[in-house]
């Protein structure tokens, strides 16, 4: 499943603590690949900012996003399943930065090509606060193989909404 681009990443266990962020709704293979890459880079601790509140309002079908507790638990469970010795710190974030601009012990931030600007923004904020710059590690996100589209929680929520609406229609037709 590893793409050739992965070879550009630092070797395993290169950093004491790494950070990454995301919504992590309906934990899917794209999330697992992203979390696995981050876990492999971390020696001691992985900090995962899980989007909540205002960070969710612009998401498609945001009303269908799993509760924050469930998403954080799924992240923690998955990371522990692949690297049990890591300290996993999943926490809700309500802005694009979360712990990445206050935790002075972080050494690297894991991003996708799409979220690279966010990683650069984190380093600008860290510089303003007198914190060290994080090494930015870019993970190539996997596509779903069949269509070549990036795996997306929004797509999964949309499919779920469409399925729910189709199931509702026959019941409504019988009622009329």
From Swiss-Prot:
Substrates-to-products reaction catalysed: (R)-4'-phosphopantetheine + ATP + H(+) = 3'-dephospho-CoA + diphosphate
Top-rank EC class of the record's enzyme: transferase
Region Disordered: start-end pairs: 145-176
Primary location: cytoplasm
Subcellular location: Cytoplasm
Activity regulation field: Inhibited by CoA.
Gene Ontology annotations for the cellular component aspect, listed alphabetically: cytoplasm
Residue ranges with Basic and acidic residues bias: 157-176
Role according to the record: Reversibly transfers an adenylyl group from ATP to 4'-phosphopantetheine, yielding dephospho-CoA (dPCoA) and pyrophosphate. Does not accept 4'-phosphopantothenoylcysteine as a substrate.
Assigned protein family: Belongs to the eukaryotic CoaD family.
Protein name (record): Phosphopantetheine adenylyltransferase
Organism, scientific name: Arabidopsis thaliana
């Amino acid at each position: 499943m590893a793409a050739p681009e992965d070879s550009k990443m630092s070797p395993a266990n290169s950093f004491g603590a790494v950070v990454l962020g995301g919504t992590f709704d309906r934990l899917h293979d794209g999330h697992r690949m992203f979390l696995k890459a981050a876990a492999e880079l971390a020696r001691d601790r992985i900090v995962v900012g899980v989007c909540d509140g205002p960070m969710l309002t612009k998401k498609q079908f945001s009303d269908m996003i799993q509760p924050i507790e469930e998403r954080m638990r799924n992240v923690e469970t998955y990371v522990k399943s692949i690297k049990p010795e890591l300290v996993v710190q999943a926490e809700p974030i309500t802005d694009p930065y979360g712990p990445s601009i206050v935790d002075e012990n972080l050494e690297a931030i894991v991003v996708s090509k799409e979220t690279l600007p966010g990683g650069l923004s984190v380093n600008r904020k860290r510089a303003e606060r007198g914190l060290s710059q994080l090494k930015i590690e870019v993970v190539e996100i996997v596509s779903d193989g069949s269509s070549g589209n990036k795996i997306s929680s929004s797509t999964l929520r949309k499919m779920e909404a469409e399925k729910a609406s189709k199931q509702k229609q026959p019941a409504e037709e019988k009622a009329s």
